[in-house]
Amino acid sequence: MSEREGHGIDAPDPAYRRLPTEGPHSPALGGALITWVEPMPEHVVGYNRWYEDDHMITGAMSMPWMFSCRRFVAPRWLQHLRAPADSRVAVPLEAGKYIGLYWVNEGRIDDHLQWSLGANYRLHEDGRGSYRGRGFDPTEERRHVFTAFHDYRGAFYRDAEVPRDIHTLAQPYEGLVVELVDADPAPGREALHDWLESEHLPRMVGGRVAVSLRFDPRPLPPDKLGHVREPEAVDRRITLLHFLECDPRSVWAERF
């Protein structure tokens, strides 16, 4: 039992009643955390058990305004599909076998980000930033290939029967294809969004490719945890997530 000054034993913090009454409270998708990680070979089992049994919950899903999540894995028999060979993100090209996707409510990404920073600093101080416990360096276990919070820009659906964007991570999609596209400085990212929506995605989405979602990555906050790599070119980059109803290999030549 504990006592909080002025509230008696185990009194709830009044902020928990006040904060939900303020600001947006929309069911819409407003942003995402996309985190693409490569564990070191000798730490694969320990890292994944820690991530799914602890960090995926306490470092993400139990926080306010985050409402859906899913992980995908790129096994060896899919990694040969990756391109370009001189990728500036996946170095080497097979790096980043695990990707976590997390949806954040519209209008709440800034609020969620502040909670996330506080919670993750606490977890590291509590010795839960590593599956090995306090005092161990996370960079010995894993490295972040591409991790960023994103602003949502829209969806391109195959047809009206495809579940809406907010439900995407709850659907039993068999595959995910991720594209990171950098815009030329001129005409810039908005022109690239227009081209993607009017020309690129209509050719790509269809058949067993059910939906594609577009996101703009944000710079990581200056007080981020030190082991998380700062993504490059976030002011020019667009992240595309293509959700498939099949093994990616079966539609790769046709769609990608």
For the regions a protein language model found, what residue spans apply to each?
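Macromolecular interaction modules
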Residues: 2-256
